[in-house]
Amino acid sequence: MLYGLRGWIGKLLPRGPFFCNLCGYNGSIWLWRGHDNQAIRKYQIIGAGRRKCDCFACGSSDRDRLVFEFLRKEIPNFSVLRFLHVAPERQLNKKLISLGANMVNIDARKSGYKFAYGSETITADLTCLPFESETFDWVIANHVLEHIVDEKKALYEINRVLKPHGKAILMIPYSPNLSVNIEGEINWNKRQRNALLGQQDHVRLYGKAFLNLWSETFEIVRLAEVNASRDLNLFNGEKIILVEK
């Protein structure tokens, strides 16, 4: 209801420099997202920090728009593909469904929930997925792995449920200034995690080493550039983190 009203209001606002590829908004008002702290500034964490990037009309984030821009250029026909969407971003999920993608949504919450557009979400643990091997063409899990202690098991499960040559987008906040990951201690409190990892519910801060570490599980791990034809108000320097089975 709220974003529906904002979408209507957005059509009346003056045109702005940025465009939302998920809802078509091209207005002058964008909303704040994220938080700022010493760790984010110190490590220049990509995908974190306080910024004015959320679409006024639909609420999509800069990351949502980045991922969709990549997918729409990568995939000619969504209707023939099956996606697993982990902790699904509402507007991205809604857009993919509108293009005919066969979406399966999961979240680790204790009880399932429905999005406003009626898509059922299954309660599931990424380290123990309730799906047969080689089930999905694509997996999308954005800003999920930094919350999971047993990262290797989660990566194994993602690889297991992907079809041969299947792909996954696994966006994470990471520091280009760190050569290795910083792993949080189990006894760290929220304040320590916020100060040392950038967010109070993260279990690690990724450094550039993740590219090599993930190569132990996936055939291909790479950072993919996204060249948008219009200015989508994206996070400066953020690229798609793409893996392939």
Language-model features: where?
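A short acidic, Gly/Pro-enriched loop at the edge of an enzyme's catalytic core
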Residues: 126-139
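S-adenosyl-L-methionine-dependent methyltransferase catalytic module, highlighting the catalytic core
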Residues: 7-18, 22-25, 152-159, 163, ...
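Hydrophobic beta-strand segment of the Class I
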Residues: 86, 139-140
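Conserved N-terminal segment of class I S-adenosyl-L-methionine
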Residues: 1-128, 228-244
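Short catalytic micro-motifs in class I SAM-dependent methyltransferases
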Residues: 143-147
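Surface-exposed loop/turn positions
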Residues: 81, 133-135, 166
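GHKL-family ATP-binding catalytic core of two-component histidine kinases
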Residues: 130-132, 149, 207
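Glycine/Thr-rich phosphate-binding loops of Rossmann-like dinucleotide-binding domains
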Residues: 93, 149, 178
